[in-house]
Regions:
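Polyanion-binding surfaces on beta-sheet-dominated domains and ring/shell assemblies
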Residues: 1-146
Length: 146
């Protein structure tokens, strides 16, 4: 895949076009598959290396009307060779902390919210769709026109 990457936008196009991140995690309680932030990062690492890029995260705790949110910003940096300079693109996502989560202390709740917000920042940046395909709901019924 080694192409001449001129800027962060070229890198983003290449990464989005080549990123494969299947939903390999299983939720047995809800009987569905999913991917988490770590899965996305694992799939991204070879592509980041190939395009001379890296990801940096910044988290911010925000309070809105007695609710606490974690605001995660993912920044894709493209290193311009031999110049010690980079160009970047950012994407931000929010996740709300639940007031109580059974079996978790406060730091675990914040950590889980951070991971969730980071996952959705990565989804936005790299055009990862977490929804079911529209055909999933079709049930082999013909479409009707109204």
């Amino acid at each position: 895949m080694k192409n001449k990457i001129e800027n962060v936008h070229d890198a983003l196009v290449l990464i989005q076009g080549n990123l494969k991140c299947p939903k390999n995690q299983k939720n047995t309680f809800g009987n569905y598959s999913y991917r988490n932030c770590e899965d996305i990062l694992q799939a991204l690492k070879p592509l980041l290396k190939e395009t001379d890029c890296y990801i940096k995260f910044d988290d911010e705790i925000i309070s809105v009307m007695d609710r606490v949110y974690v605001k995660a910003t993912a920044t894709l940096h493209h290193i311009i060779s031999n110049q010690h300079v980079s160009t970047w693109i950012t994407c931000t996502a929010l996740a709300r902390e639940p007031e109580i989560k059974k079996g978790m202390d406060l730091s675990q709740i914040t950590g889980a919210s951070s991971s969730y917000a980071r996952k959705y920042a990565l989804n936005g940046m790299f055009a990862i769709d977490d929804n079911k395909d529209a055909d999933f709901y079709n049930n082999n019924e013909p479409a009707t026109v109204t």
